[in-house]
Amino acid sequence: MANIKSAKKRAVQSEKRRKHNASSRSMMRTFIKKVYAAIATGDKEVAQKAFNDMQPIVDRQASKGLIHKNKAARHKSNLVARINAMQ
């Protein structure tokens, strides 16, 4: 553990941010998994609704720097392609 007061504070702040980021990342992954699950059921309307719920969350995490913007774009592109391929 740190001895200097400012280093102790930084350690506390870092741990707080780590927990918050982990929570946000987990939430985002859950929304992505819901889209994959909806695609697996074969219902295009449900999959589209799940995607519409997921998209702003992924974009928000990318704008905050939690994930890279290209990763967000890759997730969205992959899922849209799968949804459009459904009948």
Curated annotation (Swiss-Prot):
This is Small ribosomal subunit protein bS20. One of its GO terms (molecular function) is small ribosomal subunit rRNA binding. Transmembrane segments: none annotated. GO terms for cellular component: cytosol; small ribosomal subunit. GO terms for biological process: translation. It comes from Pectobacterium atrosepticum (strain SCRI 1043 / ATCC BAA-672) (Erwinia carotovora subsp. atroseptica). Keywords: Ribonucleoprotein, Ribosomal protein, RNA-binding, rRNA-binding. Binds directly to 16S ribosomal RNA. InterPro entries: Ribosomal_bS20, Ribosomal_bS20_sf.
